[in-house]
Regions:
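Pre-Walker A adenine-sensing motif
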Residues: 5-17
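Structural recognition of the conserved hydrophobic beta-strand(s) that form the central parallel beta-sheet
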Residues: 113-119
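Short regulatory helix/loop adjacent to the ATP-binding pocket of P-loop NTPases
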Residues: 123-136
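Hydrophobic positions on the alpha1 helix immediately C-terminal to the Walker A/P-loop
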Residues: 36
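Hydrophobic anchor at the beta1->P-loop junction of P-loop NTPases
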Residues: 25
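Interdomain hinge/linker elements that couple catalytic modules in large macromolecular machines
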Residues: 3, 142, 146-228, 232
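Short glycine-rich substrate-engagement loop in P-loop NTPases that contacts/grips substrate
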Residues: 56-80
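Conserved lysine of the Walker
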Residues: 33
Length: 233
């Protein structure tokens, strides 16, 4: 999938670049967090060719041995270069057991400009102050907006863009499929993963079918007011 410029998020990242804060990029699965981090890494390298970017992507099998906080910390420290800007970027950080201990230690050393991404099923805003001892800046990423969808699909007609956006949605990973049924299947799979794996696992929900029905109720009634007993009714 090709990259597009997402200026809203790139501007947010640029404003905190180089700060001592831990930059945390959150968002639902497949909304474009990793691609955004990739684009921002390219921008940082372009602006400062001497910068040392230490990039760990836990989506890639080659980084599986680092999925424990001691190993992750050791890897980053081994790749540190004295005398230049050292930037740490860790994709899907929640896949590393005890990741917060590695991040807190790296942050305490005051040697790194730190960026991490993670699913907000595991990194909720309320969790950040508990997990990290240093100050965090959260940048929440959403699926493509109508403007981003239009730019990606190179659609100039507002009416056509809106009609297609309503039908196809903002999940960028679905755009590689030309067949509408394949796109729908992709989005359904993402939804199933969010509900039945991420949310259920995080909150230890035993009744998966009830959880699924509750989510379907909320999606079907997104414009209505409801109280907590409503989904049960």
């Amino acid at each position: 999938m090709r990259l597009i410029n997402r200026p809203f998020y790139m501007d947010k990242l640029s404003k905190v670049a180089g700060s001592p804060d831990i930059k945390v990029i959150t968002g639902i699965r497949r909304c474009g967090k990793s691609k955004l981090l990739e684009a921002f890494a390219s921008q940082l390298r372009s602006n400062d060719p001497s910068a040392n970017v230490i990039h760990v992507n836990f989506n890639l099998l080659e980084f599986e041995p680092l999925a424990e906080y001691h190993a992750l910390h050791t890897y980053v420290e081994k790749h540190y270069i004295e005398g230049c800007r050292n930037i740490v970027m860790i994709d899907e950080v929640q896949m590393c057991e005890g990741f917060e201990r590695a991040i807190n230690s790296l942050h305490a050393s005051e040697k790194y400009d730190i960026y991490i991404t993670g699913s907000n099923a595991f990194l909720l805003s309320s969790d950040l102050s508990t997990l990290f001892t240093g100050r965090t800046v959260e940048i929440e990423v959403f699926p493509f907006s109508l403007a981003e969808f239009s730019a990606y699909q190179e659609i100039t007609s507002p009416a056509e863009a809106l009609a297609r956006y309503v039908r196809e949605g903002g999940m960028p990973g679905s755009y590689i499929y030309q067949d509408e049924r394949m796109r729908f299947s992709y989005i359904s799979d993402v939804l199933e993963t969010l509900i039945l794996r991420d949310i259920r696992q995080k909150y230890r929900i035993r009744n998966a079918e009830q959880l699924k029905r509750s989510c379907e109720f909320l999606m079907d009634n997104v414009c209505l007011l409801y109280t907590s007993p409503s989904p049960r009714d």
